[in-house]
Amino acid sequence: MKLTCVLIVAVLFLTACQLIAADDSRDLQKFPRRKMRDGMLNTKNTKRQCLPPLHWCNMVDDECCHFCVLLACV
């Protein structure tokens, strides 16, 4: 009986921790590399130049505004 209560409390506590942490990191999960790069590059004097749609790109250092799919900006 005591073990069951301890397990229920532990599960509720861990669920609450997950919900609190999920609010803080909602947008960081999608594109962490791109957001980190944009944060370092976007200062007052620099602005990101986007490649036009259907322009060739690579997955490592893409400069597409949205996505690089099958080596082409979308």
UniProtKB/Swiss-Prot annotation:
Chief location of this protein within or outside the cell: secreted
Propeptide position ranges: 23-46
Disulphide connectivity of cysteines: C50-C65, C57-C68, C64-C73
Location of Pyrrolidone carboxylic acid modifications: Q49
One cellular component term from this protein's GO annotations in UniProt: extracellular region
One Pfam family it belongs to: Conotoxin
UniProt KW Secreted keyword: yes
Tissues with expression: Expressed by the venom duct.
GO molecular function annotation: ion channel inhibitor activity; toxin activity
Region forming the signal peptide: 1-22
Keywords: Cleavage on pair of basic residues, Disulfide bond, Knottin, Neurotoxin, Pyrrolidone carboxylic acid, Secreted, Signal, Toxin
Superkingdom, taxonomy of origin: Eukaryota
Subcellular location: Secreted
Keyword Signal: yes
Record family assignment: Belongs to the conotoxin O1 superfamily.
Description of its domains: The presence of a 'disulfide through disulfide knot' structurally defines this protein as a knottin. The cysteine framework is VI/VII (C-C-CC-C-C).
Protein name as annotated: Conotoxin ArMKLT2-041
